[in-house]
Amino acid sequence: MLTDNRFSVIAALPRNDLALAEAALEGGAQAVKVHCNVWHRASGNTFGTFAENRTFLRELIALCGDVPVGLVPGGEDAYINEEERLELEEMGLSFFSSYAQYVPCHMMESTRLSSMIAIGTDYTQNTLDAVRASAIDVLECSIQPGENYGTSMNYADILRYSDIAAKTAKPCVVPTQRRIRPEEVRHLAAAGCKAIMIGAVVMGGARPEDV
C-alpha cells in the first residue's frame, strides 16, 4: 500500500472497538491499527491481552476486508509469543507495529506479516544507517517526546522527518503525536514521508463521531 500510494492515511484506534473501526473506514482510512498487551500514552488506555482480543481481531479483519489491519502486539511488559504470531498470520493480519526495543526476533522471521518498526526520541544517525540496512518494511517516526504531544507541528519537525526518510530510504509513517492539521499534511508528503497515522491526539476521543 505505502509503495503504491503517493500518500496514505492509517487510523490508529484509541480503543479496540468495531464501531470505531467502521467509522475509520467510512472516513477513508487506508489501513487500521489496533493494540494488545500495552498501555498507550496518547489515549491513556490499557489494552488487554491477545487472548482477550482474539475474537475482536477476527471480527476486525473480517470487517476491514481488503483494507490492511495491523496490530501492536505488545510492549515493554508483555508481548505475543511465536505461537500467537502464527495464529495472527492465519487470521489474515497484514502487519505488526512496535518500537524496535520491544520486538522479539521471531517477529522479524515472519514471511506473512509486514513490519512497521518505530524509532523513538533516542534515535541517532547510526540508528538511521542501521534501519536502512535492515529488513524493516516500514519505519514509524515516533520521535516526539511526551511533552510535545498535542502541540502544533513546526518546520523543524518537517526537517527531521525529511532527514529520516532520506537517510533510511524506507517508507516513513508519521504518527500524530503533534496535533497535525489537515492543511499541514502536504508538508509531510513533500518531506518524503509516505503516510500519516491518525491517533488519539487528533481524533480527540474514543467515540465513533470523533473518528
List the predicted regions and their residue ranges.
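Short, well-ordered coil/turn segments that N-cap beta-strands
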Residues: 5-9, 28-30, 64-69, 92-94, ...
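Glycine/Thr-rich beta-alpha phosphate-binding loop at enzyme active sites
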Residues: 42-47, 130-162
